[in-house]
Amino acid sequence: MTAKDLHFYEPKNGHGLKHDPFNAIIAPRPIGWISSWDTNGNINLAPYSFFNAFCYHPPIIGFSSTNWKDSAGNIQETKEFVWNLATMDLAKEMNATAAHVARDVDEFKIAGLTAAPCKLVNVPRVAESPVAFECKLTQIIQLQGADGEKAQAWL
């Protein structure tokens, strides 16, 4: 491969392609299907495409919330959340939970899912999902660009 075969991409200058290469190249991305609830007992279930594992020992996972959303606020309040595996069989239900709804609307009900109790956290998990990680918050970080300017995204 020669230099002329490469496409150089500097985000501030755009890319001239049909689709954003950042999203297309970093794929497939696992979905962080995050269940949480607030201190008033309002349940939230939402998918996040910026999700991954970050450390083996101790096991650490994380997701990025673009703009401050209910999930981030709930987790900051209660210090707990659950990551639920979104399988192909659950894709329709997962997409239904992406709807922008009022804080007191239960996405489990919208998607026809069952909220099941967990063993280590008070947050419910998706009973239909074959895997659920019960998580405790360690930190929330507001992301920033290389120029030091704060982004409207939290990890």
Feature-to-residue mapping (PLM):
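Polyanion/phosphate-binding surface patch
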Residues: Y48
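Active-site-proximal mixed secondary-structure blocks
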Residues: M1-N44, N52-L155
